[in-house]
Amino acid sequence: MVAKKTTVNEMGLSIDPLQQTEVSFKIIGTAPLIYNSMSLKAQKTLLMGAAKKTAAEKKEIKHNPEEEFVDSCYINGNNGSYLSFPSTGIKRGMATAALETAGVTKASINRGIYVVGEHINVWGKPYMNMSVVRSSDINRTPDIRTRAKLPNWCTEVTVRYINPTFSQLDITALLVNAGTLCGLGDWRIEKGGPMGGYRIVQTKDDQKIFDRLVKEEGATCQKLALENPEIEAHDNMSHELYEAITQERLKRAAIIKEVA
């Protein structure tokens, strides 16, 4: 057993510094990941307030699906990825999973572990998803939101934890449970949805899936997908909504041309 290092301060008190250990995990999604970043436009509105719309602006189509699709993403990736996700999503999931994991508490997870990096890299091709959502106002006003959806995705996380308060087995169990009980992104399992689930890469087949996504659905693929949005073939609602807004754009363009 390695002896603990003891620090003696000026008052003669001995303090045993906490020992930290890091462990890295490769993760693959078991359900699609839906992005939920707040757009820069929305952030500016919060900062400066919404300007009163002109008569011309009131006549504009309410939503711009292509713009909202891109704005929903976190674009801070590196090491071969373009997309990313806040690392706090992983930690929050682990803390929530602690409620269903014997021997640990949510408070101890919040204090004793740290997911390295502000963002984690995400590999996977984003598709445009349009769906009905409910606003958080008192009336739960319905609206259409366009977001990036990754049917297949993977990431890699490094967790730093206090040792011996936690063991590598504890961290592994928490991450496994977080992927099962919580997930990442919008409409995730924790919030009653079916999205965002994940598991740790543990088998050769899992490793093949991870390697393929990193190789084929990295930065180049992701940039092209954001520049040229596609909708999944089976996503009938998104196809119908996008067709409706496309026809409305053509109709308005024709009216403007006639007036000119």
Predicted segments with their positions:
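RNA-interacting cores
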Residues: M1-A260
